[in-house]
Amino acid sequence: MSLLENTDKIHTTQMGVGRIKRNLKLDTDDVVGYCISKIKDKNSKISRKGKNYYVEADGCIITVNASSYTIITAHLK
């Protein structure tokens, strides 16, 4: 199963929300929705390394755990 086939399972923790908002300089509280839109973007590059997926899109890198679909963190490139 790939990340794109499981976007309905993608979530994060309360700490993850704060970390992602801070790292990506986001104003929205819907960081999961924001990240899912980046993951679904046709120009995004998704790779799996070990236990995580890495999504490169619009100048940021989003890290998602491959087994739990938890967004761990996101950074600007």
Regions found by a protein language model. Give the residues of each.
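Ribonuclease/tRNase effector modules and their secretory precursors
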Residues: M1-K77
